[in-house]
Amino acid sequence: MKTQTVLAIGAHIGDAELTAGALLASCAVHGGKAVTLALTAGEKGAPAGADIAEYRRGKIAEAEAFAKELEGEAYVLDYEDGLLPDNDEVRFAVCDIIRKVKPDIIVTHHENSMHKDHIVCHRIVVDAWFYAAIEGFQRELPKHFAKKLYFAENWEDAPGFEPYVYVDVSDGYALWEKAIDHHWFAVH
């Protein structure tokens, strides 16, 4: 893999790390830049009885620890888990991060899912990818066209998903295993 910047975007912290984490780790091993963006913290997945605000802070720390392991970056937007708005405010927030990060590759959710936030995230990212590339959408940063936009699935996004790209991530797999262990869900 030539040195590239890969931006993996998920509806929740943990989504990108699971669906594209090994790709991000492989990118990092080869000198590229690995970046995650979560549109929500995924705080509604808190264990029974847990304080939601405290759990949210913990999830953000997990995202940062994962990114640090890859010498990358983690961004988390401040939208509520389960209630991700399907609007241009979110699309332009994602557009701005695309323009800031300047990825060669973006990976996000497949269009079908049992989780509404994953479906909305897919639509947001497709539009934000377009907005980021068009100079006519005046923003603080100049346009950037990410040459490749790929879709990944996890167990929630499998309906209708047909794999169409396979990447050898074996060089980064050990690093991904180490990084994913920073996530509570991976060790409990």
Per-segment meaning from a language model:
Residues 1-101:
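Active-site rim/loop-helix segments in enzyme catalytic domains that contact anionic ligands
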Residues 2-9, 85-188:
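Metal-dependent de-N-acetylase/amidase catalytic core
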